[in-house]
């Protein structure tokens, strides 16, 4: 039986942890070569090594997705070393300005310093724009179409009190994918977003045990936290032939939250 991504080349930002790491490995299991791009160099190297163990070509690149020069260098290197880019998954993101630096605290918008707002938007929205447009230019040059996928959130549609910066950034990602789908369809390039629910990743570790987190689980009809693999399988569908007629959509692996 043929693999669903056999011979394809994928670039995954945020590819060394959480949803990005699960997607790097899932894509490799289905035959893709993978460029694992992440701000944590050692974690990117470790994930790339796991991709190699699965029999695929892998490269690891350290990148700050909010830096235009670094993003362009990442795309150029991935295209050169992999032999082109067929799929991009923009999974790099933060839940708050101090993500990774201690416990994430909710802040109402009127108490949110502008520099913290900008940090979240620069990674979650600017970073997706820079990554996906740079890859789109490469795909157009290659002339063989492609798949653009970005991680948004259920918070793109339903606001979370105290997380306005995150919600706005993820709503922007969804609209960005719709606009790219409209503009890139003539090149046989699809663009879609994924809006996960509550997923067990490093981003949610600080929240677990918090009453607000427990309420989020209780609002999930399936009454469980999602796994990174739940989202990786959604990305795999959009990257594969089965997802070839989806464009401008947002899919919600969320245990049923968005139907309410």
Briefly describe each language-model feature range.
Residues 193-196, 215-242, 246, 255:
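C-terminal helical subdomain
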């Amino acid at each position: 039986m043929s693999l669903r991504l056999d011979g394809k080349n994928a670039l995954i930002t945020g590819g060394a942890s959480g949803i990005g790491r699960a997607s790097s490995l899932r894509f490799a299991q289905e035959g893709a070569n993978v460029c694992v791009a992440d701000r944590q160099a050692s974690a990117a190297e470790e994930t790339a090594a796991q991709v190699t163990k699965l029999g695929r070509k892998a490269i690891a690149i350290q990148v700050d997705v909010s830096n235009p020069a670094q993003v362009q260098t990442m795309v150029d290197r991935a295209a050169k070393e992999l032999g082109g880019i067929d799929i991009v998954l923009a999974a790099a993101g933060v839940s708050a300005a101090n993500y990774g630096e201690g416990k994430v605290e909710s802040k109402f918008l009127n108490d949110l310093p502008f520099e913290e707002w900008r940090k979240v938007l620069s990674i979650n929205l600017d970073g997706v724009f820079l990554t996906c447009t740079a890859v789109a230019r490469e795909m157009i040059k290659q002339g063989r179409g492609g798949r653009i996928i970005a991680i948004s959130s259920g918070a793109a549609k339903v606001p979370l009190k105290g997380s306005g910066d995150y919600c706005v950034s993820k709503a922007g990602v969804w609209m960005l994918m719709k606009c790219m789908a409209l503009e890139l369809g003539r090149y046989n390039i699809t663009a879609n977003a994924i809006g996960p629910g509550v997923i067990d990743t490093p981003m949610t570790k600080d929240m677990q045990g918090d009453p607000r987190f427990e309420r989020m689980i209780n609002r999930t009809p399936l009454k469980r936290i999602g796994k990174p693999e739940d989202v990786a399988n959604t990305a795999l569908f959009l990257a594969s032939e089965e997802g070839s007629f989806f464009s401008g959509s947002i899919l919600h692996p969320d245990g049923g939250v968005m139907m309410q």
